[in-house]
Structure formats: structure tokens, C-alpha cells
A protein has these predicted regions:
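N-terminal helicase ATP-binding lobe
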Residues: 1-528
Length: 528
């Protein structure tokens, strides 16, 4: 009933912070916006505003606001939940919440204590305290209804004791996001094979982790395999799984080299195992080790929309089809994808009557607004609705004359408006101060062309300080040394490292590629 109003309120508070015209209220806007997003089930956007709230929070906040902010930080950001000692009632509420998330017990007591606390705040008759205590009550009720202590045992049909150790750990989710509730409601945590459609940024990685944990805890599988079509994605998934499971589970990422660099001896380990590889590697393995599939109890295929990829989609599709024909219906197979136009057809083809389609159009990625700033001082906002969108070219590029080389007569400029790579470099230099930027090339050879152009611009005196200045100098020096050991000190890749620019493509040596991805992920480099 109130969902549309909550969405409007959250967008208003979000925009109010961006307007920068009432800075003294920004902390209230941020916390109110985070709460509005939270109550409308947009936990990703709530997390963003909550993080910004803690960067700007004022220690002089009232107690209900303080408790609410700390509780949201605890739920969304895995921050410590600090006990408020401003009033006895507030302290009791905090302690009861912390006790619940440590044991899974005492939900009824929380509601009773919260009611008493709300009554005491109303008696004080302080408007802002009343405003925040009402929102706090709503947030606590929603959080308890989506609590992992309640939903994971229910969805997996496993006793709470099998989840207890995990839920007491700091890495466990305190509540399930809509995406995780979706896979639970569809029976995926009970072993149901499924086609799962989830947009980016809604907790897909955590969903994969929960599926694997439920499969291991129930005894349905001791080995899970995750197949992802990109080597970089395999690296990212492997890091996430190692972080999530630690040394309790053996996480093994196969190389993408098509050779017999694996052994079935890895299945002799008593630990549960998570294997990660590309489709090409798995296809190679099962053609050389026919018994390999006998050891797998859970198959997870990521990025299912890659079926439509012209060069690799057929390999991926044939691999999944071959595996489906070799395994029994008891073994669980999950296909994850952000976008599948024919999801129902794929479900019938791949899973038949044994599987389900898990999809919910209400689960949306974090909304974004794109605006083009122009020399006319107007801002043109991009619309996803093609019926409302007009053709628009922003007049925001300033062309600059470059220094001439010795004996060079022709004046050269940057950017050349007919050169796509110049436009890309120009905007990357302008935008990288706001976060990492990537220039996408359609061929590997273009990577070197772009880097040579950046080096040429530096040599002609063009200011590229934004790229270098916003990168981590020490990390870039280390990467330059590593690049030098592969290519030599005078190679453009090595020189580019000193300018804050790194190459990345499939044939880059694996050690370099991993180092580049690590630097990009940890915000040490601003342009790839």
C-alpha cells in the first residue's frame, strides 16, 4: 500500500543530499533515505546511503537516531552494533537486539521493549526523537521478519542447529535480501534445480554461498562446481568463496589452460569442496576424465545469458546440455543470469518438470540517474523510456592544442572529435576522480593503440594528472616492476603503469591479469 510512497520518499531524500543546498540537514536526509530504501526492500540503495551516513554522521544526534543508524549499519554494512547508554530503555533495546542476532532467540522480548521505549520517547515530546523512534520501530519489525535465523531453517527445511554456527559468525547475513528470499521460496535451498534470474547488485554472490551451504549442510553434496564464462569472473568468485568459507572448505580454481593439470585425487580430501572453472576447461576435463562428474553434487552455472555470445555461447550451451544428460534428477543444477529473454523455454529444455524458474520483476538493481552536463549549463537527463528520449549530443568537450614535436609544422589537437579512442581517453581523464574508469576495446591490438596514444599525449605535454593522481603510487610502482619483468622497462605497458593506466585482456599473462584485477578491485588504479 505504501510502497510507491516509500520509493518516492527515498528518491527525494537521495536527491536532496545531491543538491548540496541544505548541507546542515544532509545527515538527516541520508539516514531517512536509507530507511526509506530499506522499508521498500531496496537494500542495495539503503546500503549506499547508510555508508555515506557514517562518513558524515554527527556525534550529537538524538538517541533514537543513533540507535537506528547503528542498527542499519549492523544489518547492511556488518558494522559493530554499539550499545546506546543514553537512557535505560534505549540500552535495553540495543542489548536485546544484539542478543537476538547472537542466539536467534528473544524476538518477542524485542517487540515488548521497543514498545516501552517508543512510549517513553513520546512522553519526552521531542519532535525529531518521535520521528526517528517510529522509523526505528518499523525497521526492527521488517528486519526481524526477514531474519536469517527464521528464514534459512524454514527455506532449507534443516534444523536451526545446522545453521547456528554460521549465523553466529560475523560474515553471516543478518537478514535475507529479496533475491535470497526468492531462491528460498522457490525451493532452491531445499535442492530444487532452477533457472534464477537476478539483476546485478542484488546479492547474487551471497545467494550462491547460501545455496552451497544448504547443500553441504543437508548432505546432498560434498562437492560443488561453479562455472563462469570469463576468467576474471572465476577469479572474483574464487576470492568471494575463500572469504566466505575460509579453511573449512577446499576452494580450488582450475587454470584455463587446456591441459591435464588436475587430478581426481583432490576428491580424496575429507573437506567439502568448491571447484571453479570456465566452460572450456570443464568440457576438457570431462572429455579426459569421464568419472569427474560422478563426484559433483551441485552444479552452478553463472552468466547464463552468455548463451547468446556468438563466439562462446554454443560451447557453454553444449556443455550444460551434456552435463544434464549425464547426471540424475537428484543432483541439483542452477543456471544464474541477469537477463534471459526466453527463460521459460530454457527451463523446459534444461530442467523439464524437475526444475523451477525463479524470477521476480519487483527485484530491481539500484536505480541510477544519468545526466549530461553541457557548456550551455543545462543538464540533460537520460531516460530508459525510448518514447521520452530525444537525440542529444552533450557539448562538454574542450579541444586543446598539443605541443609540437621538433620540426613538426602541423598543429595537432586533443581530443580529435572523430577519433573514438580520443573521446574515451578524454572522458576517462575527466571522470576518474569520481571512481574507476574502463575503456573497452573491441580487439586486443586496440589496447596497445590506446595506451600508446596516452603515452603520446603525456609526451606532448597534455595534463593527465587526474589519472595518475587518483591512483595509488606505490601499488602502480609495484605493478610497473611486475610488468617490466614480463615485457621490459621500455614497453608501453610498463610506461603506462607510471601514468596510472593498466591493460587487461584475456591473453594477458595470468599473473599480470590477477594483479591488475586486484588493483582495480581495491581502487589502487583508476583507468584500465
Amino acid at each position: 500500500e505504501f510502497s510507491l510512497h516509500l520509493v518516492a520518499a527515498s528518491q527525494y531524500f537521495d536527491a536532496a543530499v545531491g543538491a548540496n543546498d541544505r548541507a546542515e540537514y544532509d545527515v538527516d536526509f541520508l539516514l531517512s533515505g536509507a530507511a526509506s530504501y530499506f522499508l521498500s526492500d531496496d537494500f542495495g540503495s539503503a546500503k549506499v546511503l547508510c555508508s555515506e551516513y557514517f562518513a558524515r554522521m554527527n556525534p550529537e544526534t538524538n538517541e533514537p537516531q543513533k540507535i537506528m543508524g547503528n542498527f542499519l549499519g549492523y544489518l547492511l554494512l556488518n558494522r559493530d552494533f554499539h550499545i546506546s547508554e543514553d537512557t535505560p530503555d534505549g540500552e535495553q533495546v540495543c542489548r536485546s537486539l544484539l542478543a537476538y542476532y547472537n542466539t536467534g532467540e528473544g524476538a518477542e522480548e524485542i517487540q515488548s521493549l521497543l514498545s516501552e521505549y517508543r512510549k517513553a520517547i513520546y512522553e519526552n515530546d521531542a519532535p525529531m526523537e518521535i520521528y526517528y523512534v517510529d522509523i526505528l520501530c518499523a525497521i526492527v519489525m521488517v528486519a526481524l521478519s526477514k531474519s536469517s535465523w527464521i528464514l534459512l531453517p524454514r527455506y532449507s527445511e534443516l534444523d536451526q542447529s545446522l545453521w547456528s554456527d554460521y549465523l553466529k559468525s560475523p560474515k553471516a547475513p543478518r537478514m535475507l535480501w529479496p533475491a535470497q528470499q526468492l531462491i528460498g521460496e522457490k525451493g532452491v535451498l531445499r535442492g530444487q534445480s532452477a533457472i534464477v534470474q537476478l539483476p546485478t547488485g542484488v546479492g547474487k554472490t551471497k545467494s550462491i554461498e547460501l545455496v552451497i551451504r544448504s547443500s553441504f549442510a543437508s548432505g546432498r553434496a560434498t562437492t560443488a562446481i561453479i562455472v563462469a564464462p570469463l576468467r576474471a569472473l572465476c577469479n572474483e568468485i574464487a576470492n568471494d568463496m575463500i572469504s566466505a568459507f575460509g579453511d573449512k572448505v577446499l576452494v580450488n580454481q582450475f587454470s584455463d589452460v587446456l591441459e591435464e593439470d588436475f587430478s581426481l585425487d583432490l576428491f580424496l580430501s575429507l573437506k567439502s569442496k568448491i571447484l571453479i572453472c570456465t566452460p572450456e576447461k570443464l568440457s576438457y576435463i570431462i572429455h579426459h576424465q569421464a568419472d569427474f562428474l560422478d563426484e559433483i553434487g551441485l552444479y552452478i552455472f553463472d552468466e547464463g545469458h552468455m548463451f547468446d555470445d556468438g563466439s562462446r555461447g554454443a560451447i557453454y550451451e553444449l556443455l550444460i546440455s551434456e552435463i544434464r544428460s549425464h547426471i540424475s534428477l537428484e543432483e541439483q543444477l542452477i543456471l544464474l543470469s541477469a537477463v534471459l529473454s526466453n527463460a521459460e523455454q530454457i527451463q523446459k529444455w534444461l530442467l523439464g518438470e524437475a526444475g523451477v524458474l525463479a524470477s521476480d520483476p519487483q527485484i530491481k538493481a539500484t536505480p541510477k540517474t544519468i545526466g549530461f552536463a553541457s557548456q550551455t549549463k543545462d543538464i540533460h537527463y537520460y531516460s530508459d523510456d525510448s518514447a521520452q528520449e530525444d537525440f542529444y549530443v552533450p557539448r562538454s568537450i574542450e579541444v586543446i592544442a598539443l605541443q609540437k614535436r621538433p620540426r613538426e609544422k602541423k598543429q595537432r589537437y586533443f581530443p580529435e572529435l572523430t577519433d573514438a579512442k580520443d573521446i574515451a581517453i578524454y572522458y576517462a581523464n575527466k571522470l576518474c576522480k569520481n571512481g574507476a574508469a574502463a575503456i573497452f576495446a573491441n580487439r586486443t591490438s586496440t589496447v596497445l593503440t590506446v595506451i600508446n596514444r596516452i603515452i603520446e599525449l603525456r609526451n606532448r605535454g597534455h595534463d593527465l594528472a587526474e589519472i595518475k593522481g587518483n591512483s595509488d603510487g606505490e601499488e602502480m610502482n609495484r605493478l610497473a616492476q611486475l610488468m617490466s619483468s614480463y615485457y621490459g622497462e621500455q614497453h608501453p605497458y610498463t610506461i603506462a603503469c607510471h601514468l596510472g593506466v593498466l591493460p587487461h585482456y584475456s591473453n594477458l599473462p595470468n599473473g599480470l591479469r590477477l594483479a591488475v584485477e586486484y588493483a582495480f578491485r581495491n581502487k589502487a588504479v583508476r583507468l584500465v
